[in-house]
Amino acid sequence: MLSGSPFSLVNEMLEAPGVLRRFDSNAVAGWTKTIAAKGRLMITGEGSSRIFPAKNAIDLAMRSGSALHICTEGARQAAEYDLSKYVVVAASNSGRTRELIGLFEKLAAAKIPRFGITATAGSRLTELVDECRVLSCGVERAVASSKTVLEQALFCQSLLGGDEWKNQSRAAGYCEEVLGITVAPEITGFIQSAPLVYFSGRNNGVAEELTLKANEIARKKSAYLEGTYALHGIEEVMRKGEALVLIEPFREEVEKYKAILKEGVGLNVVAIASFDTPFPTIKIPALDGFNGYLQLMAGWNVLVAAGIAAGVNLDKPERARKVGNAV
């Protein structure tokens, strides 16, 4: 991915490592006291503002053995639950996402502790929360969210109080390296020519977020295959020429992916991984606490390369909107 691109999306992606480098991991220290007292946290939002930020935080909490109970749902589903024993944190770039505002009006009436993260100062969300943080990265011009997703994820991660922040600068450097990787024409061709692109990975928000980004950036139909879902029956309807992107695949199952999906179905399989695989692979560094960001940015790189090769306007999809469902 090259700097000086005519596309805002590319330039905003390239700003992301700097956002990580400058992020203040103590910015929401006051929130953590309220969360610790409750012991339960619901992270909500819609689309890219929730998928990676919330699920990355949950993944890191589980890996660290945190006693904090964290869950995530979209705002409409969260509104159906009893959240009286929770602290609720929401992210919305616009601060006026319809589903989210409806939930937070309900939470405000019930006086349930609630905090917000937004790119838009003075938005409706800021009026409904106990406290709000405005993203330092600024508002994006491209429809597809990138640097805001990263900063929202950093805020959610900082609620966990982990010790990985000592590697923050190193992580930012690795992110720059990943965004600077030249994507092999073979990989770009597989994505560009595929009628459908599958993304397979852990339930940590990376593969799921890239599934959405494939629609917005590369204009590709896509499907998210959680965990090892790809090995449990979907091969029946997969077709030769479709593409599968494996995100840091489970080492124990790599040969199964090869035998069943590449050789059996005829899928064009590629990987984003910190180790060598039998497939065309974008090899990336590994760093505890920041692996999700590195994997996500490698995926951005692949999708941008495919989109540019296809000649699409990366900044402006024909139908997708920056604010999907606004008040």
Predicted segments with their positions:
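Active-site phosphate/pyrophosphate-binding segments
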Residues: 5, 9-40, 131-243, 310-327
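Phosphate-moiety recognition in structured ligand-binding domains
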Residues: 4-9, 129, 266-327
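Glycine-rich phosphate-binding loops that contact phosphosugars or nucleotide phosphates
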Residues: 36-182, 235, 242-282
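Short, well-ordered alpha-helical segments
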Residues: 55, 153, 208, 296-300
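Catalytic cores of large soluble enzymes that bind and process phosphate-bearing ligands
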Residues: 1, 5-15, 48-49, 53, ...
